[in-house]
Amino acid sequence: MKREAFKMYLKPGYEAEYEKRHAAIWPELKALLSKNGVSDYSIYWDKETNILFAFQKTEGEGGSQDLGNTEIVQKWWDYMADIMEVNPDNSPVSIPLPEVFHMD
């Protein structure tokens, strides 16, 4: 199982809305992530920088960042685009973070 971390950017003033939308994550999106080996997925917010830090475990080759070709993920991106920094296709600007330490 791989561990992956990445950062994204939340627009200022949208912290509560971001949490609200994720508290009601679509069941079909959650099922897609699970079906594709994504587990132990957490997102943290740095209130000083509005950086979102995401961590997930993945089985196989892909992770949540590799599901952008699916209709449900594209709809989620569109739904979140007004409150996050996004690319032209509405995918969140996402920067992978290398692991520099791990302890079991």
UniProtKB/Swiss-Prot annotation:
Give one GO molecular function term: L-rhamnose mutarotase activity
Q: Which gene encodes it?
A: rhaM
Keywords of this entry = Carbohydrate metabolism, Cytoplasm, Isomerase, Rhamnose metabolism
Xref: Gene3D superfamilies: 3.30.70.100
Function text: Involved in the anomeric conversion of L-rhamnose.
To which pathway does this protein belong?
Carbohydrate metabolism; L-rhamnose metabolism
Reactions catalysed according to its record? alpha-L-rhamnose = beta-L-rhamnose
This chain's protein is named L-rhamnose mutarotase
Q: Enumerate the SUPFAM superfamilies for this protein.
A: Dimeric alpha+beta barrel
